[in-house]
Structures are given as structure tokens and as C-alpha cells.
Amino acid sequence: LALVEETTEESSDGIFSLKDSFKDEELSDNNESKFILTTEVEDMKRVHHLIIFPSIEAVKIIRTKLKGNMDADGRPRIRMDGKEIMEIAHEYGCIIGPAHAFTPWTSIYKTYDSIKDCYGKMPDFLELGLSADSGMADTIEELQNIPFLTNSDAHSPWPHRLGREFNELEINKLTFEDVKGAILNKHIKANYGFDPRLGKYHLTACSKCYTQYTIDDALNMKMKCPCGGRIKKGVDYRIYELSKWKTPHHPIHRPPYIHILPLAEIISIT
């Protein structure tokens, strides 16, 4: 937070840009990057939540109220459940939803079979994560009315992971309220992301040696790999467990999901 305050300034309502002293002089002002305040937090049941903030002031207030080990790493751990975190986020004008909702380690669907079991009601959005796309998620009935987001890690130490998934929103002005309104009112024009088959957690695999297994073989082995590692259910199988339909039932508001291959991946195979 101190770094954000040191290097950026609010250029419009809830939107930030670099201060002049931190700008690259070779970049045109017309191409200047803009920032919105977000964080990913881990609750007491190890479910990860994405919060999008309207202001620095809201960040400071919520930071105090969440009372967790806030400085442990880029993903604060909070001694509250999802419902409590959502109530605080909404109290201060934020929007909130589950991060990487299907991954086998720290996601809402790793811990719960229904979103309402976590929040008590539906969240503002659901982040798909790298190992799932709209076609997979729209086989789950309870997600029909929830906007999907495709985001990249902002807490990764590897710069090439920034921006590898992103969203296209229909807004009138670049302000927090317009971004919030586009998400809540389903004015997302497109999701851009990985082919989920490229995702780290797409298939059932050992968490230690990364050997992949069919779910039947994994269950017969009691989810233990011969190497001594734990076998974790893949996102594809977890969605199969949760799904009502064999094929996606896209609601009318669902935007296209456009599969992309990040530049770093293209370079690595050339």
C-alpha cells in the first residue's frame, strides 16, 4: 500500500496512474497504463477471494477491519469466513468474488459444493482461473447468473504472468463506478484467457512429481502417488462433479471466451 501511495496518484474516480516522476519518458501519455485497486485474500478455510476497491481510503479501513496477518506475503490471510469478508467489502463499496474458483488447493469449489455455502448469497463475480473457461463453468447451474472474470496473477514474482488473462468491459468513463457497473450489470464484452488445457491444475495429477492420472486410477491409489506426493483432483474433474449439463448452457449475458497464448509461451516454443 505504501508503494501504491508513493508511486501513483488518482487520475479519476478510483482509477490510478503513475506520478510523473515514475513515468517512462519514452511512453506516450495516450498509452499510459491505468490501475484499479485489488487484492486477493485467504480466509480461515483457505478459500481465496478477490476484492476490488473504490479508493485508497476503503483499502485502509478494510485492512484494519480484516485483522489478519496482512504483511505475510502478497496474499493476506484473514481470520474470517467468506460471508464476513463479503459483508465488510460491501459495506465500503467494494465488489468481491471467489478467485480461481476451481483450483484444487485454495478455491471455493475445493472447500464447498455451492457458492452460497461460503458467502450465504451469490458474489458479485467469479474468477475462472487459468484451468477453466466459460464453456466449462457454464455446465454448472448455479453459475448461470454470475459474471465471469479472467484475470492474471498480481502477486506472482514473475513479470511475464502479469496480464496473461484479461477482460474487455463496456464502460462510458474510466472510473471505478463504471468498472463496477460493467461487472455487476453484465456489460463484459469478452473474456480473454488460456486454453484451460494449458492450466497447471486442469488435469488430476500428483502435486509433487506432476504425474497425471485418470480419476479412477487416482481413487484406486487413495490419492497417493508412488513418489509420496498427494494426488489432487483436476479442475476438469471437479467441474464434472459439480455440473448439471454435459454441454455448456451459456446465458444470454455471457460474453465470448477468447483463447489466447501468452507471448512468453509463444517465445518458449519457437
Where are these regions (language model features)?
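Short, composition-biased local secondary-structure segments
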Residues: 54-63, 109-112, 191-193
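A metal-dependent hydrolase metal-coordination microenvironment
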Residues: 1-84, 128-142
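Short, functional N-terminal and low-complexity linear motifs
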Residues: 53-56, 105, 145-148, 249-253
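Short loop/turn segments at strand-loop or loop-helix junctions that form parts
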Residues: 40, 53-56, 100-101, 264-268
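C-terminal functional module detector
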Residues: 18, 22-28, 34-37, 84-92, ...
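Residues at the C-termini of beta-strands that transition into short coil/loop
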Residues: 39, 129, 152, 172-173
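Domain-core and long-helix interface of multi-subunit machines
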Residues: 67-167, 193, 212
